Every structure is written in structure tokens, then in C-alpha cells.
């Protein structure tokens, strides 16, 4: 039974502590849209998305109005397009046509982003998957809200180094084609290892082939709520600290569960999962970095940062998992540099380095995220970053990812501005010592010995 104090507390979390539902994401299967003609495939895709998602935005706004809970984004994920377009796309330009169809359909229904222009190549690439990857520079530079991801490895299969090597060149090409906008195209692309099928967040969201015809997934956000709660834990021991984070994560996730079930009921589409992630914004007081600093660090990046993040991530999961019948996606604490005020400050001061961020990815929910690097960084160096992150994910049986932006025409210390939720970031140095002979060997890195569980 709710009491009036709990109602007041929830209101305070929304009004003063920036609690919001970051996204309601509708996943839609496009497997039945495939044909042997690319124009017909595009028509099928457009028709299915605009039919299934026609009420998504209005329903999100109605739930916002009825419950007083801010819902920041409404999004769509679709089946990886490398699968949908495999029979009809004979060139990279054919895949770009599908990207335009996705962009047009998403704009028609009014969503903020659409994800799933993706390929799953953790062992090797089919001809269609390679065509899609090679189409990325044109697709991401010519569309506005289409997001893309490529899964290059997994604990079970190892790492596809041919794909990793290719992606270094692709990311450079995307950066050059969108140079007039601080290489914004790279914001819409992420390389994964152990990618989840049900991620509601972008740019890595897609509708997995193990999913049904359509599903509603919800991502919550509440670093500001956790930060405010930690004011009461100042000077207390770790037991008190952990309990505070856990209880707060439970309350945050309960809000997401309510929104997910209500959206599912109103849209007549099954509820999938709640993603428990703490997703920051560039606004003051809505920062994962601030939470880490309240745990006891002078600034993010100081010794102890990785341990503090590991503890935060674990307590968020432990608290959140009790508040929802189904959890999934990435679920943990995000560390996107450009989207987090305190991390922006730490990177600007030099306290938070790329190497420290890599260490933090061993224990956070994803990986190297929204990091601006010099525009003259080589393709092989970017491939090396992807390989390092994929190795961390593969060996530790966790999801890792790389979303770096080599900002064309800018160097260390300059600022890149991506706007809105994507924020802004100082360009940080990257070790330029060559790894080209390593990433160009070809083939794949085998799966680790502990992957053999059968």
C-alpha cells in the first residue's frame, strides 16, 4: 500500500532530481519485409514501421501527461538490416536505399531515433554484411536519425579481426563525410562485442532475431536521484552506501516498469524488458560522474574510480532487478563522456584519460562511449581501440562497445559540440604508436578457453 510520503518522494525525484524515462523503444521485426527487389523491400519496411509505430509517440505523450513522468525519447529498433536486405541488396547503394526508407518511416511516425542498420559479424562477414558495413559512410551522412551498430565479437565465437580492421576505415570515412558538423555521423555508430538483442538505447539498439514480431522495451535514467540520495551517505561505511544506491535504483526502476506496462497495454504490444541503466545528460545534476565523486573521489579518473564504478554498477543491478519482472538490455551505469557534465570536466582537466576510461569499461555497462579524439587519428589506431574493447568483453563475458568520434580538422584540447542529449566533449589524446601490423593480420581471434561450457 502506497503512503503519502512515497508519493511525495516520487514527485521530488521527478521535479528536483531529474528522474525521467529516457526512452520507450518499440522493437519491430522486419524479417517478413524481405524480398528479391530492393524497392519492394523498402516499401514493405516503410509500410510495416508506419503501421506498427503510428501511435507510439502520441501514446508516450499521453502517459507523460497522465502520470507526470517525463519520457525524453520515443524510439524504434528493427531487425538487423544486413539480414533483411540480404536477398535484394546487390550493392552498397541498395543498402543505402533501405537506410533512407528507415529514415523516412521514422520521421513519418515522429520518433527521435531508429536503430537496426546493423550487422552481426562476430565470426565472419557474409557478402551482404560486408556490403552493409561498406555502405555506412554514405548511409550515416545522408540520413538524419538512423543509427547503426556492428557486433564484431562474442565470448562464444571470438573476434572477427577482418571486420575490426575494416571498421577503422569506415569510421574515418564517416567522420570525413560529416566534418562540417564535428563528424556527427560517428555519433550514430557503435561497434560491439557480446551485443544484447533487446537494447532500447542508441546507437546500439536493434530488434534481435530471437524476439517476436513487436515488443516494447523501456530505458530508465536517474543519476541525479542517486546523487541526491548519496548526500545522506556522506561519511558512512560501504554497507550503508550500497544499501542507499540499491534502494534508490529500485524506486527508479519501478517508475520504468509502470511506464513499460502502461505503454504495452495501450499499444497492444507485449512488454519486453526494462534496461536498468543510469543514463546521464550534459545538464548539471544529472551525471554519473557526480555520483562517483560523491562516493568519495575528488574527480572522476582518480585512483579508485574503477572500484567505485564497479560498486555502483553492481548495486544498480541488485536494486533494479527486484523492481521489474524482466530486465535486459545493457543495464548498469553508462559512462558517455560527452553526455556527462562531470566527465566532460574531468576529461578537460586531464584527470580522465582514454586509458582510465578503458579500465572503467571492464566494470561499467558498456564501453568507450561518446569520446572525441583527434581527427588525424589513423584508421588502424581506431581498429586497435575496437579490438582492445572487444577483447575485454570477450574474456570477461560482458557487453563492451566503442563509439569514438575522430573529429575532422580538430586536435587535442579543442571542443566538439554534438548538441542536445549528445552534449559536447573535449578532444582527448590517443596513443599514436602504430598497431597496423597487428590489426591487418586478417582472420579472427579465437574464443577464450572458458567459453566452452557445453
Curated annotation (Swiss-Prot):
Organism: Bifidobacterium longum subsp. infantis (strain ATCC 15697 / DSM 20088 / JCM 1222 / NCTC 11817 / S12)
Alphabetized InterPro entries for the sequence: UPF0210
Protein name: UPF0210 protein Blon_2054/BLIJ_2131
Database matches in Pfam families: DUF711 (PF05167)
Superkingdom classification of source: Bacteria
Homology family: Belongs to the UPF0210 family.
Lineage: Bacteria, Bacillati, Actinomycetota, Actinomycetes, Bifidobacteriales
CDD domains: RNR_PFL_like_DUF711
Subunit structure comment from the entry: Homodimer.
